[in-house]
Design a protein with these regions (language model features):
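Acidic donor-binding loop of glycosyltransferase active sites
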Residues: 190-206, 221-222
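A short helix/loop element that forms part of the nucleotide-sugar donor recognition site in Leloir-type
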Residues: 98-112
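Short His-centered aromatic/hydrophobic patch
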Residues: 15-20
Length: 228
C-alpha cells in the first residue's frame, strides 16, 4: 500500500494469487489496470464459505481475472466469480529443447528393451493418481512382461508410492527419479511410448492445466490423462 501510494508511475498491478491482492487498498487501484491470476486449487472453496467470500471480495478489485484454462474458468464461474472479467490464457512451455546425445543414451540405458515405456512427470500428490497407475501396471505386467514405468518428481506421497511398489514387488519395473535437469527430462520423455497422468479431483485439489502434457507432446510422446 505504501509503495503504491508514493509511486505514481505505476499503471498496472499484476497479482500472481488472490491473496497477493487481498490487502491492497482498493482506493489505490482506481486509476490502474489490475489483473489477478487464478488457479483451480487456490479458488476452490465452497460458495458462501469465509474463504469464498474473501476470494470474491478480493477479485472485485480487478479489471481482469486471468484463468489458466477453460476448466478453471468454469470452476471460477461456479464459485460466483464474475465471468465478464475472466480471460483464459493457457500457460506456455519452454522453447523446444532437443535432448543431447548423451542424455538420449542415458535414457535408452534406463529403458533398455522394455515395452511399453510409460512415464509421469509431476509432483507426487494424491490428485495425480500415481497409485492407480502403479496398481494397473501390476495387472499389465501379465500382458506386457517387459513394461517399464518411470516416475519423475517429488512430493508428499513419495514414500507411500515407494512402499506400494515394494508391496507389489514392482521394484524392477517402476523407477523413481528426481532433481534431474530439463534436458535429461526431455530425453526420458522422448524415449517413452506414453506419458500418463490420469489426474482426479481430490478434496479441493484439481488439475487446472497440465503443462507436462505439453512437454510430452513437444517430444512426440502420446498422453493419457484424466477427465477431471
Amino acid at each position: 500500500n505504501e509503495y503504491l501510494k508514493n509511486e505514481h508511475s505505476v499503471t498496472t498491478v499484476i497479482a500472481d494469487h488472490w491473496k497477493s491482492l487481498e490487502k491492497i487498498d482498493q482506493s489505490l487501484l482506481h486509476n490502474k489496470k489490475t489483473l489477478c491470476l487464478i488457479h483451480s486449487k487456490e479458488i476452490n472453496h465452497p460458495v458462501g464459505s469465509g474463504l469464498n467470500e474473501r476470494v470474491l471480495n478480493t477479485l472485485s478489485k480487478t479489471n481482469f481475472i486471468i484463468s489458466n484454462s477453460n476448466f478453471t474458468k468454469k470452476l471460477a464461474i461456479s464459485l460466483n466469480i464474475s465471468p465478464e472479467k475472466i480471460k483464459v490464457i493457457n500457460p506456455g512451455v519452454e522453447k523446444y529443447e532437443k535432448p543431447s546425445d548423451e542424455n538420449i543414451k542415458i535414457s535408452k540405458e534406463l529403458f533398455k528393451n522394455s515395452f511399453p515405456k510409460l512415464i509421469t512427470v509431476s509432483r507426487f500428490d494424491k490428485r495425480k493418481n500415481h497409485d492407480k497407475v502403479i496398481m494397473t501396471i501390476r495387472n499389465l505386467r501379465e500382458i506386457y512382461p517387459n513394461i517399464k514405468y518411470l516416475c519423475i518428481g517429488y512430493g508428499d506421497e513419495e514414500n507411500n508410492l515407494k512402499k506400494l511398489v515394494k508391496e507389489l514387488k514392482l521394484e524392477n519395473i517402476i523407477i523413481f527419479k528426481k532433481n534431474i535437469n530439463s534436458n535429461l527430462k526431455s530425453a526420458f520423455l522422448n524415449q517413452s511410448d506414453i506419458f500418463i497422468m490420469p489426474s482426479i479431483i481430490y478434496k479441493k485439489s484439481v488439475e487446472g492445466f497440465g503443462i507436462s502434457f505439453m512437454e510430452a507432446a513437444q517430444q512426440g510422446t502420446a498422453s493419457i490423462g484424466g477427465i477431471d
